Amino acid sequence: MEMKVFNSLTRRDEPLAPIADNTIRMYTCGPTVYNFAHIGNFRAYTFEDILRRAIQFNGMRVKQVMNLTDVDDKTIRGANAANVKLTDYTQTYKDAFFADLKKLNIQPAEVYPAATDHIPEMIALVEKLIEKGVAYKSEDGSVYFNVRKFPGYGKLAHIDFDNQRTGARCAADEYDKENVGDFALWKAWEPSDGPVGWDSPWGRGRPGWHIECSAMSNRYLGAVVSHLERGAVTAV
C-alpha cells in the first residue's frame, strides 16, 4: 500500500519512499525542558508515534531523531530563578519527559540529542554560514542569518517579505512570537544569562534555537535533505 505525506513545499500529498536501506529518516521537535510537558505537547508526540507506526506498518524502517532543547531563554530563566545549575534544572524535566513517554506507550526515538551536547557542531555550522555570506556578526557579538541572502527563504511558510511588519524583535528565541527579518544563530552573552555560555569565534554566548536543530539533524541524519521533519509551525 502506497503511503503519502503532505509536502509543505509543494503543498500537496506525495508518496513517501525511503532514499536508501528501506529506512525513513525522521527528525521531530522534542521538548524544551524548562517545565513538565503538558497534554498539548504530548498530542504532538502521540501523532509522531502514530506516524512512525504507520511507516513501519507499510514495511519500512524508521530512524527517528528527537532533539531536547536544554538551553534557551526559558531554561536559563528557570535555572536562574531556582538558583541551580542549568544542567541540574533541565535534567529534572528530561527525566519526567521520558517517564511520561513510557507511560503513554510511545515508541522511543533512536536518538535523543541534547542541544548542550552539540555546541561545537553548532559553532561550526554558523562558521560555514558566515563563509557562504548568508550570516553576519553584529556589533555585540551575536550572529544573524540574513534571510535576504538565501534565495527561496520563506517558501515553506509562504512568507511575503514585502508585506511583513518591521520593528518586531528577532533576537529572543522565545517560541510565542514570530521572527521578523534576520534571526539569531548565535546570541552574545548577557548578564541575565548568568554562568551559561560557551566560547566561540565571536565571543562568549550560546546558540539561537534555529541553529540547534539544523546542526543535530545534520549530525545524525546527514546534510542531504531527504528526511521527514515534524514540529511546530515556527519551524517551517
Describe the function of each predicted region.
Residues 1-236:
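NTP-dependent nucleotidyl-transfer catalytic core
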